[in-house]
């Protein structure tokens, strides 16, 4: 009767599986079939016989696979409820299936083999070794039955190692039992694997040349591949003694297989894992056999053979692995020589370097890049860096670097052998470009290491390359009329042009070498005359190509340190740089400047600035010449852009700091700022800055024309406003008093001392800046008011979007790839709207930068300005409701944070508290509303739809901006309230990267975080205190893991601890504790967040439970909480007389209590849990038994259910 039922059910199941797998089935039928199959697996009592019948080899593959899936489901989810006989029957049936129910090795489907091995491993995980002691013997018996069974045994051993050791997918006790039993049998297992490999390889090599035995040869090859894969799964964790046993027999076998095409990749994988292992010095020392003649011969010949037949994907993949093996060998050698002085450099070290250099000169950019780290380790190594073989390879390495630094090999191009390899490694030119830039940065570090060892050779080669480029004719490459090809204007170079890529590479090389050479050589050894000669050649070089000119400018900067030894050269250098400041590529044409031209001019200004910053003493004797140059350029209002003017003014200010005379510098700054003061304080400007309608008209935002070709009537007005703001910021940023206290005193910069004895300085620019402050605050107030809807309507149609975020910022915020090409031949601004957008954006940023710099720059002179708090509240904090998130974020970062951090404590009450109280309250209200909208949107639309369908959607941008504003607000609160620690784990960059990545490592909550004096001051004010607490604890429930992590570890507890001594309302305590539990629900899936939140909840409960019974009521609402366990926890907590358990045990107990509210990753939320029972302890030492207990014991040992 049962067989009839089985047959009938199997027929139904076959039909259902056929419907599921038939592409022509409708969705409805497919879902019904799936439901039937799932219900069968969950509920049917005769799953095992049905599964076995469906798994017979007479069935088609999809039916067999489903039958085996049924058996796997039974083992995973029903095993604990099965009787001993049922388990034995199922185990024997599966082993019989493997022995006689499989096809020949080349015919059997891989997915059938995979599921068969999974079933056996699932049974092993539940019963071995206690209840299945003969498992290894049974596998050995199976192994002898044929090639398919051999391969399956390999799969079983590999999967067992992966589940137990690599992925650890079973309970701790079971994992420990199985791993210890594996370790006990490891010699036997590895010998078995190695013998299997050798036997099958020998058979394969004998048969592969005989066409009549091709099938048998392939079968042996399959088993060999499986044996290599299984070895790879064990080599990673077994004792190194096993790997190096019998004079490294395993390693020797793997080296031999490097020349066997079908097996070389697996052999290289195993070698790589073995050589990369960490372990005892004595054990790792034996792996030095790989530097022997035989091993080196096999590695070299394998590399040559694989590379000989052109680009074949399989061979290329092998080359990558082999390159990694050589890298690991180099790292092994470095480690061993550093640890043991008795170890000698291998005789074949030179041969190793030659083979490694071959990978460095390979056309593949990926292979070249893979060698950088190891070269760096070799060149930095204390012992190897002095080795003659390594020193001899330096010229060859530098020569290779000169080729490798050239950016060639774009996947879309065909101008280099690298291109073909890049098409395998990169999806697009943008991917390649990002990879190359990162790789070149690493390469530069290695070049600097080489220069440290042999500066003269490095400089000589850099000099030769520079001379060659100066004498070579310009090759712009093939002309392409398509603008996206990146061809330059008027026949100039593009970023792909042969000449430009050579110039760019040479410049990078020269810069790396010279910077390091000046650090390495003594003054007497520096090749000053050669350096000056090179600088003279560069200064005499004439060219009009903007891209090449940028490289020339970098070379001037790189060679400039030589001028410190020949100061007479300085005027000549400045003369050249000033000629670049006014560079035009098309003569006196009034056409808009291109990006390439703008970049050259900015680069020149930046170079002058850098020289004045780094070598002010050198420039000071030539100050008058520099000043007259700059005054001449500034006299023509249209000659330079406002940024260029400001950069040159900054250069003058930097040199003026060397006056070290307060009065002299103050007079100079008055003279320098006179044009700015005249414009800024003029009646016309005052009216424009203080009246919104006048401002709109003054900047031209009410004009309807937006054609860039039409003359811009208000362009000069905007330029003047920008010039003033740029100049105020530049002067304030660059003016400083002497760093030496005695010099500062002598120069009149010190005006007194604080009560603690610190000197009080005065800044020479203070008077000038304070004169301009009122109008600056008026501009800030006016700019903020622009965002009101009624003011936006006063703007002409194209300019209503002028206050929006620019496209480039959107792209950066969304993390979208930047376009590879900057269109150098395009105008800087294509429309007046784009120009106006940039004007408003830079003006807004610079105003807040000025207010942010005012505190640290002018110190007490700024903080004692009359009614400063009310002036700032009436300007910078006006109309915040309409200010967009990206602007508010910028304001918090560049203005509010430095204003607070540099404020003397005596001004906390009068300045900081009146500003921060309303600000924190407002920020909490704004962020709560924003996150509520985002959470509602997620519920209504589904997260995936928002995040994946259209990453450029407005919703995605808004959410990311809210996230960034949240982080900035939390950062500000922490800067105000929390004392900085020496080891600050949140010192991650404020760049908004992937949250998951930041949460990858568990962060232990810190116990040394304390409130600052400012934090204590703020907490005295009830409104500020409430805003801080609510914001900190609310942030735990916002969907931003980084903000949650920071608040949990650094903010919540110190703030709460400050108010716990007072009287907290019960409702407030309930809300605070609930917020933490909600945070766990939201962020529990991230290990780092979860650990911190559990710790915080534990701290709060332990501290407040004795005083507030209400907190117990919150605990009782947690899903699946164990009330008895909670009673036990409370009993120990509330009864001081009971001995307290260790902190970790109490915390673990608490974590188990609140487990019901800890959020899980989406992938685990609906997954059926697998329960594996622990078996009797296998390796635990039993307690000594009394004689009477021994006599009374009925069982003499462990029961074994899988006895034959």
Swiss-Prot record:
Lineage: Eukaryota, Metazoa, Chordata, Craniata, Vertebrata
Protein name: Exportin-5
Organism domain of life: Eukaryota
Region listing for Necessary for interaction with ILF3, in residue ranges: 533-640
Biological role: Mediates the nuclear export of proteins bearing a double-stranded RNA binding domain (dsRBD) and double-stranded RNAs (cargos). XPO5 in the nucleus binds cooperatively to the RNA and to the GTPase Ran in its active GTP-bound form. Proteins containing dsRBDs can associate with this trimeric complex through the RNA. Docking of this complex to the nuclear pore complex (NPC) is mediated through binding to nucleoporins.
First-listed, main subcellular location of the protein, grouped into a coarse class: nucleus
Gene Ontology annotations for the cellular component aspect, listed alphabetically: cytosol; nucleoplasm; RISC complex; RNA nuclear export complex
Region (Pre-siRNA binding): 641-642
Keywords recorded for this protein, A-Z: Acetylation, Cytoplasm, Nucleus, Protein transport, RNA-binding, RNA-mediated gene silencing, Transport, tRNA-binding
Provenance organism: Mus musculus
Listed GO biological process terms: pre-miRNA export from nucleus; protein export from nucleus
GO MF annotation, one: small GTPase binding
